């Protein structure tokens, strides 16, 4: 399967419009005003570049802005946010802050999603980014024409289309808006209700119901925790935490049932891989998201953007065929400090602060990275991963572009807090993490109410 990447890469080279690498971009267009887009804008502003953020919704914040609606908004645009009521972050806040704009001392490590959204708005006000953000501007097409990019967008309130020229494009449209629902035998036979976690907004509406939750990623575990005392029956189907019994499994009520993968659905429930049968009223798929870049095509941009991967990207950021286009925020693992580093790298490239290798060298680097992932037993859909060593990735960005080197303690906290999540799902958010040096941190059990230091 990895060989297909090489074939697709060669085909993309045949249609690529060729490399054009300006020393400094006079106009930069950013797609998306979520975490990654805002981080990029701040650095572009630091370097004195002219930029505009095109945001499809009426608000900044991307998935961090809670919206109780599902389906479409007042302009008929899909609700992009996958946020839900009472969400708390699943990584310590020190791993999520923008560089140079840290959270105030004394804040608990696992803040609410609402508090983090307030922090993002405070960041925008502090750096004066709002005047460069164009809301209700849905990007519909991006095309390379000679030495410029033509970016077409629709004003969602008027349905009028406009096209602007850009020297440099940063794609920061996020990866948590297009639900991934796997095909499972018998789905069409099931007569109950189904939904994806993207449309999960609050627990109370499931009170008294019998619910099947599929998936054990961050949203799956959160939904299970929220529903455990609400539903009359809660079935959790997952294959990731096969050894969960060796950890400190939450003290779920008697209505909780853990199951392996669904073998096939029935009219009123499902048969699982252990050949047991359960009935339920609702299925919630917590099965992740697809990439979604409908405004790009290989012919128009030189990039191959599918629902599972975007390629070929040098350093998981730069469009190798057209290096005046970068992507911020589609890499794995999803580590906010990593996104901030990518944003800084993109801004430095747009500002002409460093020069990329030749196309041939970037391609060889990318192919070597793909081979490394293959040897490390990564899946094909993980081709946008930075690899098993996040610290080495930070060092590479620092060495090439002069991006300030992120101390190794951040990666250590990321790994350690993830381990704590598995060991104590019920209480892992009650710990405080405090970074005390470039290599050391402290962890303390400190349950307390939130006092958010930021206003609306």
From Swiss-Prot:
Superkingdom of the organism of origin: Eukaryota
Record has Amino-acid biosynthesis as a keyword: no
GO biological process entries: alkaloid metabolic process; protein homotetramerization
Residues engaged in binding NADP(+): 215-220
Catalytic reactions of this protein: senecionine + NADPH + O2 = senecionine N-oxide + NADP(+) + H2O
Recorded GO MF terms: flavin adenine dinucleotide binding; N,N-dimethylaniline monooxygenase activity; NADP binding; senecionine N-oxygenase activity
Residues that bind FAD: 32-37
UniProt-recorded name of the protein: Senecionine N-oxygenase
GO-annotated cellular components: extracellular region
Signal peptide bounds: 1-22
One Pfam family cited in the UniProt record for this chain: FMO-like
Location relative to the cell: Secreted
Main location: secreted
Tissue specificity of this protein: Hemolymph.
Temperature dependence: Optimum temperature is 40-45 degrees Celsius.
Cofactor: FAD
Subunit structure: Homotetramer.
Keywords, comma-separated and alphabetical: FAD, Flavoprotein, Monooxygenase, NADP, Oxidoreductase, Secreted, Signal
Its job: NADPH-dependent monooxygenase that detoxifies senecionine and similar plant alkaloids that are ingested by the larvae. Is active towards a narrow range of related substrates with highest activity towards senecionine, followed by seneciphylline, retrorsine, monocrotaline, senecivernine, axillarine and axillaridine.
pH-activity profile: Optimum pH is 7.0.
EC number: 1.14.13.101
Misc. remarks from the entry: Larvae store pyrrolizidine alkaloids from their host plant S.jacobaeae as non-toxic N-oxides. This serves as protection against insectivores; after ingestion of the larvae, the N-oxides are reduced in the gut of the insectivores to form toxic alkaloids.
Family: Belongs to the FMO family.
SUPFAM superfamilies associated with the record: FAD/NAD(P)-binding domain
Transmembrane residue ranges: none
């Amino acid at each position: 399967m990895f060989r297909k990447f090489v074939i697709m890469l060669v085909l993309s080279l045949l249609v690529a419009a060729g490399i054009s690498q300006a020393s400094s971009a006079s106009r930069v267009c950013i797609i998306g005003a979520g975490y990654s887009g805002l981080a990029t804008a701040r650095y572009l502003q630091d370097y004195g570049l002219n930029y505009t953020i095109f945001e499809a919704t009426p608000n900044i914040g991307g998935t961090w802005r809670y919206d109780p609606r599902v389906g479409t908004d007042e302009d008929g645009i899909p609700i992009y946010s996958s946020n839900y009521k009472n969400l708390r972050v699943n990584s310590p806040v020190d791993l999520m802050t923008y560089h140079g704009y840290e959270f105030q001392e004394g804040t608990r490590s696992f803040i609410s999603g609402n508090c983090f959204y307030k922090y993002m708005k405070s960041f925008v006000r502090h750096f004066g980014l709002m005047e460069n953000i164009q809301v209700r501007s849905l990007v519909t097409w991006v095309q390379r024409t000679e030495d410029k990019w033509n970016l077409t967008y629709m004003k969602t309130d008027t349905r009028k289309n406009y096209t602007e020229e850009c020297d440099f494009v940063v794609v920061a449209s996020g990866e948590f808006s297009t639900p991934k629902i796997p095909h499972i035998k018998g789905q069409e036979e099931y007569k109950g209700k189904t939904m994806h976690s993207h449309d999960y907004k609050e627990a109370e509406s499931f009170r008294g119901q019998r619910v099947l939750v599929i998936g054990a990623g961050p949203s799956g575990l959160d939904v299970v925790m929220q529903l455990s005392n609400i539903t009359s029956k809660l079935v959790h189907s997952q294959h990731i935490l096969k050894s969960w019994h060796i950890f400190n499994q939450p003290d779920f009520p008697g209505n909780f049932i853990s199951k392996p993968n669904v073998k096939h659905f029935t009219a009123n429930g499902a048969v699982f891989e252990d050949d047991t049968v359960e009935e339920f009223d609702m299925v919630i798929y917590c099965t992740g998201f697809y990439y979604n870049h409908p405004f790009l095509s290989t012919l128009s941009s030189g990039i191959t953007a599918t629902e599972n991967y975007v390629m070929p990207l040098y350093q998981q950021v730069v469009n190798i065929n057209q290096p005046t286009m970068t992507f911020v925020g589609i890499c794995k693992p999803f580590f906010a400090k990593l996104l901030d580093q990518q944003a800084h790298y993109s801004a430095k490239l747009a500002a002409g602060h460093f020069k990329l290798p030749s196309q041939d060298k970037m391609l060889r680097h990318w192919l070597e990275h793909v081979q490394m992932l293959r040897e490390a037993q990564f899946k094909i859909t993980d081709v946008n991963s930075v690899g098993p060593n996040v610290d080495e990735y930070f060092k590479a960005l620092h060495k090439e572009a002069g991006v300030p080197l992120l101390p190794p303690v951040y990666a250590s906290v990321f790994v350690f807090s993830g381990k704590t999540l598995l060991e104590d799902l019920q209480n892992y958010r009650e710990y405080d993490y405090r970074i005390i040096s470039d290599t050391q941190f402290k962890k303390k059990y400190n349950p307390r109410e939130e006092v958010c230091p930021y206003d609306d």
